[in-house]
Amino acid sequence: MDPGTLNSVINRLLEAREKPGKIVQLSETEIKQLCFVSRDIFLRQPNLLELEAPVKICGDIHGQYPDLLRLFEHGGYPPNSNYLFLGDYVDRGKQSLETICLLLAYKIKFPENFFLLRGNHESASINRIYGFYDECKRRFSVKIWRIFTDCFNCLPVAALIDERIFCMHGGLSPELLSLRQIRDIRRPTDIPDRGLLCDLLWSDPDKDVRGWGPNDRGVSYTFGSDIVSGFLKRLDLDLICRAHQVVEDGFEFFANKQLVTIFSAPNYCGEFDNAGAMMSVSEDLTCSFQILKSNDKKSKFSFGSRGGAKTSFPYPKVKSILSSQNSKEYN
């Protein structure tokens, strides 16, 4: 994909900042190029990404394109900030195509600064049902959806930040004994109904569970705080960072701040009154949270930091600073 075409695609996608909800016109050829080129980059990079801070971590977006643009507006557009997204870019929201196309375009333009993990919705069996297939078919063709599927089958599934913070979309697996197992997962691959890859994208923490429990989703497991503590101790890690669940404040701790859930789609589906969040990891592994708030159903948002307390994780290398700042409202 030549630089001129890539820049043109990005510029057109960013023009939507002025008109939230505007459909961006991209050609079928441009979308195919985004998929083919990014697919090659995903396969050249490892399935377990090894990244260095500073980096900003974002959770589910689900086709809420105006909210993705707001995240960049306040976190800094690439390459001014490094990003790691935890998956679930498509389905449910109105603009899955704009969302995934901008993310793939940034991946191509800044392959060493911009990283995308796979979520459970980056799977043909799921996004065939929950909106992405229909959006592709309505705006382009079923063939385009299949090309996206080939691209999604090559996405990495986990990341390790400075050997301390372990990131994935869903959660842990009873089969996960060594990070080498993730490196050894071969791509391209669909997401199986069970096993390590399935669990990394589907499992959930549960405060009422000790050990492993059944999952109400009908897929994978739930796991308790004891599983989190044991896993971190065994692999000498400090924090698990995942997405996959709507949380009211955009982020939510579990297991005495050894795990954090990040969800970046505020007012999810227009049905939840949740905030969205982004976690910033500084060079010294200080973690802070920026909040994109949903104030009402008409999508007025405020963006600021959350809290007013300083707390430390059990291991000294990773800290959480929840600094208090005045929130600013954005229409």
Swiss-Prot record:
It is found in: Nucleus; Cytoplasm. Binds 2 manganese ions per subunit. The active site is at H121. One of its GO terms (cellular component) is cytoplasm. SUPFAM superfamilies: Metallo-dependent phosphatases (SSF56300). Mn(2+) 2 binds at D88, N120, H169, H244. InterPro entries: Calcineurin-like_PHP_ApaH, Metallo-depent_PP-like, PP1_catalytic_subunit, Ser/Thr-sp_prot-phosphatase, STPPase_N. It holds the Pfam family STPPase_N. It catalyses: O-phospho-L-seryl-[protein] + H2O = L-seryl-[protein] + phosphate; O-phospho-L-threonyl-[protein] + H2O = L-threonyl-[protein] + phosphate. One of its GO terms (molecular function) is protein serine/threonine phosphatase activity. Its cofactor is Mn(2+). The modification N-acetylmethionine is found at M1. It comes from Arabidopsis thaliana. Belongs to the PPP phosphatase family. PP-1 subfamily. The keyword Oxidoreductase does not apply. This is Serine/threonine-protein phosphatase PP1 isozyme 7. Serine/threonine-protein phosphatase that possesses phosphatase activity toward para-nitrophenyl phosphate (pNPP) in vitro. Its EC number is 3.1.3.16. Expressed in roots, rosettes and flowers.
